[in-house]
Amino acid sequence: MALSKKKRAAQYKDLDLDVRSEIADLFRLLGDPSRLGIVYACLGEPVSAGDIARMLKISPSLTSHHLRLLKVARLVRSKRKGKQIFYTAADAHVRRILFDMAEHALEHEHEHEESSA
């Protein structure tokens, strides 16, 4: 059963400093456009680091560096298949956060387009 907005707000209102710091660190990680692009690339089917690098037009070594940081933060997970490692979003929470962020940004974009017309 889903919590009401009021109950959910009350539940998270008094998060301690350690939890708030962890959340801030996650947002800092996602504040880098390359890392954010990597996590978005991992939302669908499992994808290799090389494919991510090609999609985002960034170097394979930088892609690997970002993937290591994102794995430590539990935003992506990896699975080895043969000689390759494939990456996916870590869980439904991560997918929901990124979908909601994109919808929020696109909603603002649509509002801006409508007011310009």
Question: What kind of region is each of these model predictions?
Answer:
Residues 54, 65, 71-72:
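Alpha-helical residues within the helix-turn-helix
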Residues 69-70, 88, 112, 116:
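Alpha-helical and His/Cys-centered functional microenvironments
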Residues 17-61, 85-93:
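N-terminal helix-turn-helix DNA-binding core of bacterial DNA-binding proteins
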Residues 31, 63-66, 101:
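Generic structural signal for conserved hydrophobic packing positions in ordered secondary structure
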Residues 71-81, 88:
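Beta-hairpin "wing" of winged helix-turn-helix
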Residues 1, 58-61, 75:
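Intrinsic disorder/low-complexity segments
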Residues 1-22, 93-117:
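Amphipathic alpha-helical dimerization/coiled-coil segments
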